[in-house]
Amino acid sequence: MLYVTYRMTKIAINGFGRIGRPAFKIAFEKNDAEVVAINDLTDLATVAHLLQYDSSYGTYARKVEFDQENSFLIVDGKKIKYLSEPEPENLPWHDLGVDVVLECTGFFETKEKMQKHLLAGARKVILSAPPKDDTPVFILGINEHEYDSEKDNIISNGSCTTNCLAPMIKVLDENFGVEKGFMTTTHSYTNDQRLQDLPHRDLRRARAAALNIIPTTTGAAKTVGLVMPHLEGKLDGISLRVPTPVVSIVDFICTLKREVSVEELNDAFRGAAQEQLKDILAVEEGQLVSMDFKGNPHSAIVDLPLTMANGNLVKVVGWYDNEWGYSNRLVEMAELVGNKL
């Protein structure tokens, strides 16, 4: 699904980590979006190094330099203002003409906190995570048509897992009717976990990420109920964090309103991948493993050989690059928001 804007959308990225950096790389290739500023508390030299070299995705094809004296990150000769301001209200968004802030720090997850970007002069804010309050959530391919530029100044792009799960459920629900379901995501570890055993508010996440399968919570299934309200309260799930650096997989089991066959299910996904959810959802017919999906831009890649059906009880499985795929949707959401300014 391609969102083309008819104006140049000026983007600022707040937080230049595992989502901020790929979002920058994706936006840098757009003709209708421009990253004009990056704000992160890390020093500029380190930021430039981490943008150029990535353990998961390899060396960035663009040349990365920096101007320490004038505080610019320079990518293929293009200068991007670099800031290290901890308080969003003090950022120069007005002076830089920022249209959309991508809030990627993981620290500002409520309207009250994100409002500070608007006070600083930004026109819109998109959170790259599920919100901690009633901030509206929009998922491309699901409910983006409900976005109202007149009132939706602060929105959430949901989580990587919700962006994978929701299109899968949409196909099932529109073709067969979903009654209720449970989801398990086998998810690559993230920086919210510990490299070695160390205190954490979640005692399981306190354990060494590279040595354990770590059961933990996820709000992804419940968030689907926010963007598909008729399913609210009917979905839930857990996450299993595993010792892989990137790419995750959702296993969704549900009951449908009628009995179906595996072929009916897979045909529905094939059709959606070619039409309604093109560029959002894809299908895979081969015998692949997680690293085969690294760098895949889709929200969900349904693994058709893993589909199962027993009457109206079904299992469907979808892969997703929890960094690159999600970051594509984040930038596309910024394009959509920018187009409606």
Language-model features: where?
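AMP-binding (ANL) adenylation modules
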Residues: 241-245
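Short clusters of hydrophobic/aromatic residues that line enzyme substrate/ligand-binding pockets
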Residues: 73, 138-140, 154, 196, ...
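Catalytic core of tubulin tyrosine ligase-like
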Residues: 175-239, 254
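Short, solvent-exposed beta-strand edge segments and adjacent coil->beta transition regions
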Residues: 151-152, 208-210, 247-251, 313-315
